[in-house]
Amino acid sequence: MDIKLGKYKPTKEEYIKSFKDMLLLRRFEEKCGQLYGMGEIGGFCHLYIGQEAVISAIDMVKQKGDSTITSYRDHAHIILAGTEPKYVLAELMGRATGCSKGKGGSMHLFNVPNKFYGGHGIVGAQVPIGTGLAFVEKYNDTHNICFTFLGDGAVNQGQVYEAFNMAALWGLPVVYIIENNEYSMGTSVARSTFMRDLYKKGASFGIKGFQLDGMDFEEMYDGSKQAAEYVRENSFPLILEVKTYRYRGHSMSDPAKYRSKEEVEQYKERDPLVIIRKTILDNKYVTEADLKAIEQSVKEIVKEAVEFSENSPLPDEGELYTQVYC
């Protein structure tokens, strides 16, 4: 099986939905950055700004029953998995109404009913768990698959290769999505791994891999749909390396001095949100006024999330003793 781009193209409705989804993620993350600067959000906070086309496309090709797991840059993933933004923001602000009851914060978002299993703070630790989720699907013969996200830094973790081996050995239905945003914290891919084509990392286990442009929604949609079909039909893992870029630092505490302004601006010229907006207008899918209405609705959603979170109570002290295991 090879991914041959051009097989699938998003529908008019999917373009419009993706624009709204990506815009919501962008405005939500921008608001998170603002609230962090105001001291309303504490701890670590990793923003997804610039990478929205990746999760938007994956969400389009998911089927009901599929599961998702990712690392600590997880705000976008849980929102598109079906969690209302207000419950995500409440969690970031440490409120009892948050999706993890105010105890998980930015890096440990969960919504098990929606089959979103985190939000994991240890680099690469989610990969064996995602592999285990795929095992459950195979064991129960559900024909569901697990989308397991990891970053370019995680591919240097030993447990990732142990997971690859078991997934191939047992024929597990998992898509490993390597979100390669060029930097593992402040360390470039060129400085951290000899094999820079990360999609080839599973070759020794017989796992096929493909590289996609993560800044291009159309390519992401096409390639991701083919990848999901392959994994679902063959019950065998596959690796997608998506070349993407984060506009902000690794976290809110990172000034990102290890890269130039010119480099960042070069990627911003390929901003997926700008490109999909232009595509929609060029094809006359909707009017400028329609897009303005979408932008206003997104603004209201984010505003509601802020108001809800600010008016939500802090967790009761008794929560210190719940969900604690010895």
Swiss-Prot record:
Cofactor(s) the protein requires to work: thiamine diphosphate
Molecular function (Gene Ontology), one example: pyruvate dehydrogenase (acetyl-transferring) activity
Enzyme class: oxidoreductase
CC terms in the record's Gene Ontology section: intracellular membrane-bounded organelle
EC number: 1.2.4.1
UniProt cross-references to SUPFAM superfamilies, sorted A to Z: Thiamin diphosphate-binding fold (THDP-binding) (SSF52518)
Keywords: Oxidoreductase, Pyruvate, Thiamine pyrophosphate
Coiled coil: none
Substrates-to-products reaction catalysed: N(6)-[(R)-lipoyl]-L-lysyl-[protein] + pyruvate + H(+) = N(6)-[(R)-S(8)-acetyldihydrolipoyl]-L-lysyl-[protein] + CO2
GO biological process terms, semicolon-separated: pyruvate decarboxylation to acetyl-CoA
Function as written in the Swiss-Prot or TrEMBL entry: The pyruvate dehydrogenase complex catalyzes the overall conversion of pyruvate to acetyl-CoA and CO(2). It contains multiple copies of three enzymatic components: pyruvate dehydrogenase (E1), dihydrolipoamide acetyltransferase (E2) and lipoamide dehydrogenase (E3).
Subunit structure as annotated in this protein's UniProt entry: Heterodimer of an alpha and a beta chain.
The name this protein goes by in its record: Pyruvate dehydrogenase E1 component subunit alpha
Phylogenetic placement of the source organism: Bacteria, Pseudomonadati, Pseudomonadota, Alphaproteobacteria, Rickettsiales
